[in-house]
């Protein structure tokens, strides 16, 4: 039955679904996990990178990209689709800065990306973007924001969220572990993001990519050694938690 309605993006199935959009969401669910945490004075984005083939040149295919000096984006899904979206968003940020003489707000650029995605769900001869985006950064007033957009064109703001493979598991982890006091500083926000990735990372700490954005400062990508230090702290805390549980029993 579904094959009658999934050949065109503009045709609804009898039960009210746009099957091509749902297929795009499935492409996101098969993508590498991406997480975002909004702290009191920073925004942290983290992704799990795919392992590089043995004979492949280890060129960096970053899943965390700058859209403007104050806006950073991570994504899950089809990398080629993300490349097009990133280029469009970067041009829009530059155009806005030239025309209005002010940088874009986080909601403005998120809405632009969401509207572009939505257009591709109503146009013949096109297909939806197979990516979900986590967009973080700071507005001119210094307030931090973290948004997520879906292939359907909807977007929401979050304190912490995840997308991609095992996103549901990570969201449940955030719901249990996110505390305002825990992310009051950069250290706590980074630790929470890395711990969330470790919950689902198939290759452990080896292929994690973490970026920190602070207001008025350039984006900072964490070195592998720094991530390893955080992992050691997290493992030590887990051991202490297990020890406390054993003592209670």
Swiss-Prot record:
SUPFAM superfamilies reported in the protein's UniProt record: N-terminal nucleophile aminohydrolases (Ntn hydrolases)
GO cellular component: cytosol; nucleoplasm; nucleus; proteasome complex; proteasome core complex; proteasome core complex, alpha-subunit complex
Matching PROSITE patterns: PROTEASOME_ALPHA_1, PROTEASOME_ALPHA_2
Disulfide links within the chain: none
Keywords in alphabetical order: Cytoplasm, Nucleus, Phosphoprotein, Proteasome
Coiled coil spans: none
GO terms for biological process, alphabetical: proteasome-mediated ubiquitin-dependent protein catabolic process
Homology family: Belongs to the peptidase T1A family.
Subunit structure comment from the entry: The 26S proteasome consists of a 20S proteasome core and two 19S regulatory subunits. The 20S proteasome core is composed of 28 subunits that are arranged in four stacked rings, resulting in a barrel-shaped structure. The two end rings are each formed by seven alpha subunits, and the two central rings are each formed by seven beta subunits. The catalytic chamber with the active sites is on the inside of the barrel. Interacts with PI31; this interaction is reduced by PI31 ADP-ribosylation.
Protein name as it appears in the record: Proteasome subunit alpha type-7-1
């Amino acid at each position: 039955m579904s094959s009658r309605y999934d050949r065109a993006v503009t045709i609804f199935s009898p039960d009210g679904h746009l099957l091509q959009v749902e297929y795009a969401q499935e492409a996101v669910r098969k993508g590498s996990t991406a997480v975002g945490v909004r702290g009191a004075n920073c925004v942290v984005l983290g992704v799990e990178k795919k392992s590089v083939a043995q004979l492949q040149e280890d060129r960096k295919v970053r899943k965390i990209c700058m859209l403007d000096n104050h806006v950073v984006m991570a994504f899950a899904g089809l990398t080629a689709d993300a490349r097009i979206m990133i280029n469009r968003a970067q041009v829009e940020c530059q155009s806005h800065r030239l025309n209005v003489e002010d940088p874009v707000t986080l909601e403005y650029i998120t809405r632009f990306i969401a509207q572009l995605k939505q257009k591709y769900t109503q146009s013949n001869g096109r297909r939806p973007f197979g990516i979900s985006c986590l967009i973080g950064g700071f507005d001119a007033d210094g307030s931090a924001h973290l948004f997520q957009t879906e292939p359907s064109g909807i977007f929401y703001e979050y304190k912490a969220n995840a997308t991609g493979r095992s996103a549901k598991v990570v969201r449940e982890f955030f719901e249990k572990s996110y505390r305002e006091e825990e992310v009051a500083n950069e250290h706590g926000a980074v630790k929470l993001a890395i711990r969330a990735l470790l919950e689902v990372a198939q290759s452990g700490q080896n292929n994690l990519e973490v970026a920190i954005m602070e207001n008025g400062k350039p984006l900072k990508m964490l070195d592998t050694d720094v991530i390893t230090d955080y992992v050691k702290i997290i493992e030590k805390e887990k051991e202490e938690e297990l020890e406390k549980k054993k003592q209670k029993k």
